[in-house]
Amino acid sequence: MIKTFIKERGSWILIIIFLQCFTVFIAYLDSAIPLAPVFYSVFLSSMIFLFFLAVRYKKETTFYRKLEEWDKDLDVTNLAAAESPFERIIEQTIVKQTGYLQEKAHRHETALEQEKDDLLAWIHEIKTPLTAMHLIIDRLEDRTIKGQLTYEWMRIHLLLDQQLHQKRIPFMENDLYVEKVNLESVLHQEIKTLQSWCIQKGIGFDLQLEVTDVLTDAKWLSFILRQLLSNAVKYSEASDIIIKSDVVSGKTVVEVTDFGRGIEPKDLPRIFEKGFTSTKTDQTNGATGMGLYLAKRVAEPLLIDLAVSSTVGEGTTFTLTFPKENEFVRTLGM
């Protein structure tokens, strides 16, 4: 701040130095003027000027230091009171601009909230004809057409589900209900949802659960597992998906393993990025690159570590590592 102040008041300092030098120069040229009193006057005035600068530094930088340290939360009450006319101009400008930004942010927040409510209402409304469509598809006798329609229905269902949860994620922490969740029950419910699709593709499930209860939020855990299971089914054919749970180093670990095509090593670091789809095959399958991204976002507030390992041509394993119960309770302040 001192360097900034000196730079700002550089013109003052230069003019004082010039005037002092000019005074000495005039005294030097005029022999009638004794130099000793002139030097004394120059020294004394220089000391007074330095004292003046020190006082002005403390007085002027208080406002700007507070401004520099101001927490950008649009709360102008934390600003130091303006004293000089120029400081008051700055203060008035900040207050005016802050008020404008607060009003704009409020309007934007209200619009987003309205958009979210409208979209959620629309998604809930569309689920009724979607359920009726599923019942109609189940009554079809042509297995080929039934299989094709089931797959397309499942795509619509999962995309709507992703949109529903994507809009809820920003408010997720206000929506958490942490309890003992029966892992087997959640898995059976999600597998049942994918049943028609799995039958079409000849896919079964092998549950090897050493641990059946986890401390988490049931609906958000269901969403994470739904993304992992649908991803496994999508890229597998005529094989089993193995789901294991066990305790490793005091933490519950759940693994979802498929024996599909696997993921290229170069794609693994980006698999959880928003909108990332690895190959052209993904595009023909209608991948949006949102499922795993949303699963990762949901896992973070739940303190679940979501990791992936894969071998091309052999399959993929997604691993969910749950926190220790006491660590989870302490972090969430339960």
From Swiss-Prot:
Gene3D superfamilies in alphabetical order: Histidine kinase-like ATPase, C-terminal domain (3.30.565.10)
Where does it primarily localize? membrane
Topological relation to the membrane, as annotated: Multi-pass membrane protein
Reactions catalysed, semicolon-separated, are:
ATP + protein L-histidine = ADP + protein N-phospho-L-histidine
| Residues found modified as Phosphohistidine | H124
The record's annotation in CDD domains points to: HisKA
Record field: transmembrane? 13-33, 35-55
Q: Which UniProt keywords apply?
A: ATP-binding, Cell membrane, Kinase, Membrane, Nucleotide-binding, Phosphoprotein, Transferase, Transmembrane, Transmembrane helix, Two-component regulatory system
Q: Which GO terms describe its biological process?
A: cellular response to phosphate starvation
* PROSITE patterns named among the record's database cross-references: HIS_KIN
Question: Could you tell me the EC number(s) of this protein?
Answer: 2.7.13.3
Function statement: Member of the two-component regulatory system BceS/BceR involved in the regulation of bacitracin resistance. Activates BceR in response to extracellular bacitracin.
Its protein name is Sensor protein BceS
Source organism of the structure: Halalkalibacterium halodurans (strain ATCC BAA-125 / DSM 18197 / FERM 7344 / JCM 9153 / C-125) (Bacillus halodurans)
The gene that this protein is the product of is bceS
